[in-house]
Amino acid sequence: QINTKWVLNKKINLPVKLTTEQKGQLCDTLKTSLALLSRETDPVTFADEQAVQLFNMGRGFSIALVYLKKDRRLSLESYIGYMAFKNGIPVSYGGGWILGTSCKIGVNIYPAFRKGESAWMFCQVLRLYHQNFKVSYFYVNPYQFGKGNPEGLKSGAFWFYYRLGFRPVQPDINVLSKTEWKKINTDKKYRTPVNILKKFTAGPVSLHLNKNNTPAFFAPEISTLISNYINKHFNSNRKAAIQNGYYNLTTQFQLTAKNETLSLLYLLADKNNSLSLKEKKDLANVFMLQYNNSEAAFIKNLQKCSGFWKLLNTQGQK
């Protein structure tokens, strides 16, 4: 049994110093490894090669973090890909979609390595995202443990996450999982029926590392807030809303660079007077970093951007 929180809090090493040539070679390795599996992920396909990082996690295990090129980045979340190696051999890949201190995490362990150290390896991925990006809330979509994924159901993947401390977000499913877990611990021969495992896929599972820092919003919810505002105030004309936001930004801060997400967020702030001038300026500065700086810097600054979170809370209460 792995003590997840103990593992996640064990201090990580600084990234390995890589030359420009070594970074290029590492990115080639990532692409080749996925190609051999007939797989592809956006961070690997559209990698910012000079931003790639490699971390030694101990016991011959290392993880490469790969970032998207500036023109491929998402509007709100930061999609950070990874590939893990055991003694230099690729054993796992996936990615994390980070927004604030929350992260939707996905993992794919190569078939030959799915037994034995699978849980420990995934914990190392969580450890890296927790410490390198200050993530305190991880969640896993139901597909990872069986929704539309027969292999996930057959393998009982739900219990893989459960043993690491993840719990169903939906209260009724959480109660059901506790009942099943008790049966498993009482009778070692007991196996959860497939129809119960299917019920578990009604919603995501999550891991809280800081109970006092539960995320209030996720990217789809923010998109819905913005869409509802556009529908109400601009008769569903997104282009007009964006242009209005640009005008306000240009008028108040003389910003000429284009960022549609910032334009729409600023529009919400400006129309509702929910932010002070300083908070608006901080919001603008953070989102201008999104395409003009490293994605790691954007993640860090967005976490500290009180105006962004205040704006969402104000809109969410309406």
Q: Language-model segments: which ranges?
A:
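Long, compositionally biased intrinsically disordered regions
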Residues: 186-318
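A conserved beta-strand-loop-helix scaffold within acyl/acetyltransferase catalytic domains
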Residues: 11-114, 123, 127-133, 267-272, ...
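Long amphipathic alpha-helical coiled-coil/heptad-repeat bundle
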Residues: 1-8
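Acyl-donor binding region in acyl/amide transferases
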Residues: 98-173, 178
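Extended amphipathic alpha-helical segments with heptad-repeat/coiled-coil character used for oligomerization
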Residues: 175-185, 198
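Short low-complexity, flexible loop/linker segments enriched in glycine and/or proline
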Residues: 153-155, 183-187
